[in-house]
């Protein structure tokens, strides 16, 4: 006897169970002629779930609602199922990522989606908060996937199915390419999974949305007309005369002009003689005599009043035991620093010929402190110790030269790799 799943054919929460069924071989059928907002309000349906939740699974032992619970149930119907892990720690990690996908990814996508599609009132601060929280979650997921093909272990698990279905909703409704390109490992993961045969059988050919839906225009309620009887009952009041308003001012009352975005505090600093883009071009274009041309040019351009230099060192170098994981860690950090590209230049060195590898770097920032918005938005910053360069110390100044130049050996050790943020 097949289990009956009550949901629409395009319900991403139903997809979770249908994909699990493909992996387990459990027979699950969609209820015929299900219509959201109609079927789930019938007396028969409300007997299965008093609040009309969708999806709902009918089983020989009674109904189950909540999509993650349904997917877990179907996964556990098959003994020794790799979808739920082979050890207690695997099981815990699978549950961890299921919760993460629901609370950090799905919840924020839904908060972004509902007002854009007219299901809730559009409030710009609420949308900004949802997008910011979603980016933070995708950043964390991107870091994990930099060194992992799947969320747990080396095979598809229930966590991958649920998180991918959550991402599916975002990729197909809201998250355009320019948004997801900030998270390349998430992109690679998503497209790898949705093109797996068992996923594809349920999801079909997945296409990423090309635009974010515009905000629905709010209709102003029409003013009720006063009845003639009311007009007769109430004596006319003398209207107060107000000076005629300029047309421009009157128009503002009807539709307020969009407020300009607040400027970044770094744009409000006193002008600097150093043009950061000029330095970046000099760095990129210097192929020979690097110290004589690029390094000398840097110090000629450098404005100690308008910019500051900072050394950084990874706090947990003892953990850097795998070369490609260490390189991906640094690469992910540089990707997440993209928000500071207008105000920063950086060099990161991965040092050592054998593990554990050391990660050290040098950063040039606009202003005299590390920009607060960078500290707040890029969580990698907390993983490094930061020391402001003292230019009165010739040894520190020479160390700046060596980092910019990728000098090898560096502090007596070979360089595994050098990465530049510009």
Curated annotation (Swiss-Prot):
Basic and acidic residues biased stretches: 223-250
InterPro entries the record matches: EF-1-gamma_plant, EF1B_G_C, EF1B_G_C_sf, Glutathione-S-Trfase_C-like, Glutathione-S-Trfase_C_sf, Glutathione_S-Trfase, Glutathione_S-Trfase_N, GST_C
One Pfam assignment: EF1G
Single annotated GO MF: translation elongation factor activity
Span of domain GST N-terminal: 1-82
Gene3D superfamilies xrefs: 1.20.1050.10, Glutaredoxin, Translation elongation factor EF1B, gamma chain, conserved domain
PROSITE patterns in the record: EF1G_C, GST_CTER, GST_NTER
Domain EF-1-gamma C-terminal: 262-422
Residues covered by region (Disordered): 210-269
Keywords: Elongation factor, Protein biosynthesis
Start and end residues of each GST C-terminal domain: 87-215
Keyword Protein biosynthesis belongs to the record: yes
Highest taxon of the lineage: Eukaryota
SMART domains noted in UniProt: EF1G (SM01183)
Oligomeric and partner information: EF-1 is composed of four subunits: alpha, beta, delta, and gamma.
Chain's role: Probably plays a role in anchoring the complex to other cellular components.
Name of the molecule in the record: Elongation factor 1-gamma
Species of provenance: Prunus avium (Cherry)
């Amino acid at each position: 006897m097949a289990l009956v799943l009550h949901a629409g054919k395009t319900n991403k929460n139903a997809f979770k169970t249908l994909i699990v069924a493909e992996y387990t071989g459990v027979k699950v059928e969609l209820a015929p002629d299900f219509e959201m907002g109609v079927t789930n309000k019938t007396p028969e349906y409300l007997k299965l779930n008093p609040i009309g939740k969708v999806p709902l699974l009918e089983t020989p032992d009674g109904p189950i609602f909540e999509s993650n619970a349904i997917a877990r149930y179907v996964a556990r119907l098959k003994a020794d199922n790799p979808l739920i892990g082979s050890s207690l720690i695997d099981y815990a990690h699978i549950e961890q990522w299921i919760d993460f996908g629901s609370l950090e990814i799905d919840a924020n996508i839904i908060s972004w989606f509902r007002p854009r599609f007219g299901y809730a009132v559009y409030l710009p601060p609420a949308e900004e908060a949802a997008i910011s929280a979603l980016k933070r979650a995708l950043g964390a997921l991107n870091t994990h996937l930099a060194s992992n093909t799947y969320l747990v272990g080396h095979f598809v698990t229930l966590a991958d199915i649920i998180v991918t279905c959550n991402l599916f909703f975002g990729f197909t409704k809201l998250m355009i390419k320019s948004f997801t390109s900030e998270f390349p490992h998430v992109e690679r993961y998503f497209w790898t999974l949705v093109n797996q045969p068992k996923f594809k059988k349920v999801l079909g050919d997945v296409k990423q949305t090309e635009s974010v839906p515009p905000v629905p225009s709010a209709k102003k309620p029409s003013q009720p007309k006063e009845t003639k009887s009311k007009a007769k009952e109430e004596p006319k009041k003398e209207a107060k005369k107000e000076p005629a308003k300029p047309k421009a001012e009157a128009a503002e009352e009807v539709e307020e002009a969009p407020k300009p975005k607040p400027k970044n505090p770094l744009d409000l600093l006193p002008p600097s003689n150093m043009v950061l883009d000029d330095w970046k071009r000099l760095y990129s274009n210097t192929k020979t005599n690097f110290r004589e041309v690029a390094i000398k040019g840097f110090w000629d351009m450098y404005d100690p009043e308008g910019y500051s230099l900072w050394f950084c060192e990874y706090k947990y170098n003892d953990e850097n035991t795998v070369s490609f994981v260490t390189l991906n860690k640094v690469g992910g950090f540089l990707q997440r620093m993209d928000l500071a590209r207008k105000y920063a230049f950086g060099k990161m060195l991965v040092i050592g010929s054998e593990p554990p590898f050391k990660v050290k770097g040098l950063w040039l920032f606009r202003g005299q402190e590390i920009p607060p918005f960078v500290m707040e938005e890029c969580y990698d910053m907390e993983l490094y110790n930061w020391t402001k360069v003292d230019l009165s110390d010739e040894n520190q100044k020479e160390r700046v030269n060596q980092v910019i130049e990728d000098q090898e050996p560096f502090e007596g050790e070979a360089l595994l790799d050098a990465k530049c943020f510009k």
